[in-house]
Every structure is written in C-alpha cells, then in structure tokens.
C-alpha cells in the first residue's frame, strides 16, 4: 500500500512539474462592453524584468504560454485607455483571467495626444510593441518597421533594404528564425505581436553583426498562407517581385518562396580622371568621357523549407535555397590626354557575370530541463561563378589595346555551429558555443594572362558569454577563442586569437539609459584578394592578388545614451574603431612601368563617429518626424601614405498616416567612406511614397529623386603614383516611378513556430575582379 502511494505521489509530482512548465495566462481586454484591439499586454517580474508581451487580437484576446511558476505583474495599456496592472502571485498553473476591464482616457501633452509605441529596455535588447494605428496603416512588415522608427535603423522601401548606422549587417528574423527580406515584405502587420531589437548583439550573432531585428509573430497550428508583393516601374525595367506559400499539417510546416529582381537602364556612363606619375618625374592625366550605355542585372531566388515541431520541446528546420544572378555591362567612352585633347581614342568595355549558389541549411533546437537549450546548425554551399570581360582602346576599328579575361570559379564551403544556453539565476544567463567553417576555392583565370588557384581556408571558434542584471545595472562579459588557417600551394598562415567582449549598461529610469560596449575582433582577408593572380585592367593598369595577406585585429568602443520624453525621443551614439595592420590598397609601379593595384597589410586605420538622432511624434496619430546627423572622421596610415578625412552627413524623414492612407518622404546626403587611399562617395537621394490599404490589399506608388535630374555616385583615389577621380551616372535613377501591390490571404493558420536562433550563410565567391 505504501509503495502504491509513493508511486502515485511521484507520478502526481511529475505531472505537476510538467504542467508547471507549460503555464498559460490568457484573457480578454474590454472597454465599455467593446473588445480593445491591439492593446499592449506585458508580463514582467515584480522587479520589472520582461518575461513575455504582445498585443491583443481583433477580439481583444491574448494568451501567453510556457510561463514558469512564479510571481508576476501583468501590465495592460492601450492608446486612449488607462493602464491596468494585475498581480499574479505564486502563479503555478494556467490561469484564465476572463474579461479585463480598462477605462477610456486621453493623455494630452500640450494638446497633442501621446500615441507612441511602447518600448521596454531589456538588458540585451529593446522590446517594441506596435500601436494599433501602426498595425492598421502599415502595408507589410517592412513598412511597419519604418513606422516604428528603431534607433539607428534605416528602412529603404524603394530598394527593400534595412541597414544600420553602425558597421555590419542587419539580421532579420521571425520568431527567432532567420528571415529573408522577402519574408518581411509579405508579412501581415496584424500578425506582429512585437519586435525585439538587439542593437548590441552578443557573440552568438557573430563578430560583424550591427543589429538583429526579430519579428515576434502570432503562432499558428493549421492552415496555410499565400502572399504576393510586386514592385515594378511602368517606364523603366525595374522590378522586385516576391511570392510565398506556406502550408501546415499537424506538427509540420511546408514553405516555398520565390523572388525575382531585375534592373536594366540605357543611360549609364562614367567619367574618369586618372593621373600617372613616373619615376623620372614625368606625368600625364588621362580623361575618360563616358557615352550613355546599357547596364542590366537580374536574379532569381528560390527557397524550399520544411520544419517540424514537437510541443515546444524540440524543433527541426531544413531549407534548400538556390540563388542565380546574371549581369551585363557595356561601357563606351572617349579617351584623351588632358594636355592633348585632340588625340582621342575610343574605349569599349563589355563584361558579363553569372553566379549560381545552391545551399542546404539544417537546424535543430532542443529545450532541456532547468532552463537549458541546445542549438545545432549545419550549412553547406556551392558557388559557381563565370565571368568574362573584353576591353579595347583604339581609333575606328584599329585597336591599340585589346584585353580579354575570363574567370571560372568553384567554391565549396561548410559551416557547422553548436550553441548551449542556460539560465543560471533569475537575472543571469550563460551562453557558450563552437563554430567551424571550411572553404575550398578552385578558380581558373584565362585570356591575356592565365593562371589557376586552389585555396583552402579554415576557421574555428569557441566562445563563452555571461550576462546578468543587478537592479538598474546590466552587464555582459564574453571571451572568444579562434583559430584561422589559409593555404595556397606553399603560402599561407596559421593564427590563434583570444578575443574579449564587454557590455555595461545603466538604466536611470524607464525612459533613460546609457550603455558602453567594447570588443576586440579579427578580420580575415577575402579569398578573392589572396589569389596569386594578375588581371589586366587597361593599357596602363593591372590588378593583382596578394597571397601574403594576414589576419588583422579590430578594436571597437561604443558609448550610447537613449532617452524618451512624451512625444520626443533621442539617441546619442559615439563610436571609435582602430584597426591594426588592416588590409588596404596600395598602388605601385612595376619594372614594366605598369601601375599595379593590389592590397597589403598597412599600418593602421581609425574612425571616430559621433551621431545624434531625434524623433518627434506621432502628432495626433498622424505625423512623425525624425532627423539624424553625424560626423565621420578617418585616419588611414599605410606603409607609404597617410590620409585624414572628415565627412558630415544627415538623414531626415517625415511620415504621415490617416485612416487607410499612409505616405513618407525621406532624404539623405552623401555619407562618405574613406579606407586605405580611396574616398567612396555615398548616395545623395530622396524618396517619396504614398499607399492605400483595403483589407488584405495594399496599393501604392514610390518615386526616387523626383526633384532632381542628375544622379551620380563616385570616388577618389589619393595614390602618390596614380591618383584618380571618377563619377558614375544613371539617368533612370532620377524621377523613377514605381508602382507597388501587396496582397495576402491566410486560411485557418494556428501553427506555433519555435525560434531558430542562428544564421549561417556563405555568399563570397572568392574570385578576383578585373574591371575598374
């Protein structure tokens, strides 16, 4: 009898434990007998640590799952309503709060209604809850992101790009799973619960990630989803079209996505001024006056996805991708010596390129006991590259210079990664991981000069990172060990590194915080720069690889302050970066008096960047203004050169939305970059957009540079022996009109998506380019 009681008690305890690990909290928010749609619901601990959050659906309902036993506060707020806090003491089993009443209220600030999105500053991320108006007026996930105005994030709807003011890439995710921009373009705004913005990503996200934007969307269980996003110009061959299908069956999800991009213009040309200086003191300047020519590019991207989830315990995801890109460029110019303008030569350059990149991505995530998790990811990629270039200089049909080059490249790569995470205490977490990457590049160069290269590259890293919070102070300490190896015939390198990372933050209040971030990282030379290859550029210049390039060290420090006051918010950011022995360009004269452009490990490179960002709005739930400005100061030291450069830049944007209409106007000037001896001029452009949303259909228009008729980009080279300046013109980039249509339909989707937390990809072909 006692034995039976013990067994029954044990089973009961086990059931209680299992049940407690899946505690649910749900309810319905109502005001004056009407459901409150898009009300913000946040679950947090008694000391204000964020646990879960989101917004209510169209019927005022919300549900939070997988909550651990404990005592919490449930905070409910909504635009135009009084906030309400519900204490959930000793929560151990699922709880249905039923109908939760909140009262209407208007909060005025100088006769302007405060309707900004709720922002929660967590230790390692910002959690942003979209407002009801933002969810209703946005046409897709990208326009919603633009309306939410994340600090230091720029959204370009014309080019479908998301970038950061900081250096590095922006990772896009949905429920933690790596997402392409095509997924965001067909995401319904009403499916977005919140956005988690990692503006200081940890070691698990990689060394060169500027920010991570994670869309937390509603979980579904059954049904399917079909979406289309088309963006095309009626007068220029310019388009970006996306199509996605997802179908769910029990614990499985099947997905297909297709993207087509095309560009073709007939009024593209370039102007160059190049000076060549010889050892005897003589020199001359050659001028290239471009003639409008044709340039085109198009690409296809297809992805097949299958995922399987077992009740939140483990998750498997497999993705097969194929990307194909092809480009063609024709340049015609007149060439002459500045001192002898009557002696004109005709220059013709024709180049084509094709890249095919299939890949397989396998991902596994498992939740373990005691707040532990394990992630394993493996990605294999093959890149096939084919390109050719012809270049002639001469009079009529008599070429004086005739250059032809071809490149056939094959690159194979494998990336494997494992991550282990554990919650040590209620306010601290431990993360550790290993990553292994191996690449093999086999390239054949033909034409006037022929060669073959076989390059092997290996990178292995292991890291551990500990993060926590003490009252208003939060911290993170990380240490990464790495091994890098490169081999090409008898040349190569082996390098071991130990790299620390530190993040310290202090939150003065819910609306003001300050943060410091310091890190040391390594940058490896690209395979395309390390090949022992020479490619002729023109009659005077040669591009050469350098197999003696070595890994270099990057030191980076950032100090940031963020503040909010009613309708006003701002961000002050100061960053300093120092690179020791960076890989930068140099130009030398060889024994044949040819000017060889190559790369080498130079002395140092420094960048100082203060930036200020201010936001105002939304005013009366209609207008939002934002303005950012900063200064880039560069100090570039080579083995035989030293350059400094200062650039002031700005970006301004105004957004308006009223009922089903929304519009925006944004502009920015040149944000220039100086590296080595090259000054690269950033784009100076402005964009105007207007859209109308009706249920699942969104139609609109955008125009690029409607108020100017001269679009150009360019740069300068400050070499002692071969300085140059160039401008690239594209007439079609002025007054470019684009029509946009988004449509989606879902049927019975109730699928719960787990989080894929790593993103590995290889897109570097590893071939040396021969053009200017």
Placement of each model-derived feature along the sequence:
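Outer membrane beta-barrel strand-and-loop segments of large Gram-negative receptors
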Residues: 413-415, 455, 461, 546, ...
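Face-selective signature of the C-terminal outer-membrane beta-barrel domain
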Residues: 299-327, 350-500, 507, 511, ...
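N-terminal periplasmic accessory domains that precede
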Residues: 96-101, 111, 141-144, 160-162, ...
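Short, acidic Ser/Thr/Gly-rich low-complexity loop/linker segments typical of extracellular
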Residues: 46-61
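Short, acidic, small-residue-rich periplasmic hinge/interaction motif at the N-terminus
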Residues: 40-44, 77-79, 95-134, 143, ...
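Surface-exposed extracellular loop regions of Gram-negative outer-membrane beta-barrel proteins
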Residues: 485, 510-557, 574-592, 707-722
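Short acidic/polar hinge/loop motifs at secondary-structure boundaries
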Residues: 175-202, 304
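Extracytoplasmic beta-strand/coil segments of soluble accessory domains associated
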Residues: 142-177
